Amino acid sequence: RGLGDVYKRQVYDEFSTYIGAEISKRRGNILTYNARGELCVVGDDIGEFRATGNLQTKFKLLKKDATISAEGYIKNVTPSFYMRHFHSRYFWWDNRDMNMIQQIYAGAKINLESTRTQLSAGIESIQNYVFFNKQGMPEQKNGNLQVINARIKQDVMYRAFGWENEVAYQLSSDKSVLPLPQISLYTNMYLKFKVAKVLMVQLGANMYYNTSYYAPYYEPATQQFQVQDEVKVGNFPLVNAYVNFHLKQARFFVMGYNLGSKFVNPNYFSLAHYPLDPFVLKMGVAVTFNN
């Protein structure tokens, strides 16, 4: 709307009534499960339904717990209100012809306490996926969108030494509407020990990294992320070094943030056109007071 346009107040009144059921077994060492579903029978979202479920089994491996779990859902949902209606000075839309979104997901997870290992994977199919296009307007994709993800988390602990690692793989069947970095990783290496039997010290460094991709642009006017194909983000290691101290009820830290900016090409962005902070030395103190 322009400065000379006349604004008209518009009131929306929506309601929906759902019926649902749930069945679960939360006790037991061999098998636990939970399943629930709901259906909209009256109102603006009539026909909308959600069905979710998960199950888990537990057993001993090398004298420690190991679990295998699976989860999934089927959904048929109406696009959110602000995807259909939004009125502001810079953006204005009324999408009355949007179709319902269908989602089918299946995933599994393995957790091995004996080796400090976690494995997970999942696949999702989305029909009529809604996204924000390059102009910052909501748009609905025709056809299916598939997303595959796999993740492994491996921790190594030996006396004072700790090493935490996590790697994720993601694949989108249509990167023009849902861009994802193909590989993301996090690693954190540290030493944790006591000084004079009272001061806990943690000295270490961590790193975040993801492969380059056309990361979404954040539009402040709508507070949403929209797709773009102008600049790629990623392929830059965000390295931080830190020292944490814990003395009774007091905790304090010193961190060198984004050390990599001192040694490599400063092409570091978290989102399109949103750079990360350059090297910064951070310090902080926290004290817990008991009443």
What would you call each of these model-derived segments?
Residues 1, 5-291:
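Exposed, low-structure sequence patches enriched in small/polar residues
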